């Protein structure tokens, strides 16, 4: 696929029923915003993060090198990543094997598209939020490892909801 971005849904975004809904919703938002993206599809393998974390370096290496070869064959430069674990692998682990890509986390891209006016917030769309108050859970890999905290909250606020922080 020759596009500005490759969208990488990851294993959970491709196989888990609930996360497939997230993938479809993200694709709809990207299309609405006019983002030039492509999907690799069945050639995308698991990023290998889980295998590596469990100590199976051989399987990680096999998956990662196959993915890098596939991404390079398609000329991928920028990758929209839905799964924080995949983002971690693509951004921090793959360069050790020659995979150098600009990793864009979907929450950050959505926030930017709202800020640019390419995605309307609830106010501009004349819509009402599905929920008035929302508590957002920071996943470990998105928050602690990637330091992405503000963008997801900005997207929730743009949807017209108040973000209420959890007690720590």
Task: Describe the role of every protein-language-model region.
Residues 1-168:
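Iron-sulfur cluster-binding electron-transfer modules in prokaryotic oxidoreductases
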């Amino acid at each position: 696929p020759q596009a500005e971005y490759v969208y990488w849904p990851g294993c959970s975004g491709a196989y888990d029923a609930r996360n497939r809904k997230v993938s479809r919703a993200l694709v709809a938002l990207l299309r609405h915003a006019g983002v030039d993206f492509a999907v690799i599809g069945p050639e995308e393998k698991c990023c290998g993060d889980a295998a590596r974390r469990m100590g199976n370096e051989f399987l990680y290496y096999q998956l990662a090198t196959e993915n890098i070869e596939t991404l390079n064959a398609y000329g991928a430069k920028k990758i929209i990543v839905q799964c924080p674990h995949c983002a971690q692998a693509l951004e921090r682990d793959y360069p050790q094997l020659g995979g150098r890509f600009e990793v864009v986390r979907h929450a950050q891209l959505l926030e930017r598209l709202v800020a640019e006016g390419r995605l309307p917030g609830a106010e501009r769309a004349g819509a009402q939020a599905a929920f008035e108050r929302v508590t957002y859970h920071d996943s470990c890999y998105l928050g602690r490892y990637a330091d992405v905290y503000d963008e997801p909250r900005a997207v929730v606020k743009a949807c017209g909801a108040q973000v209420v922080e959890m007690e720590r």
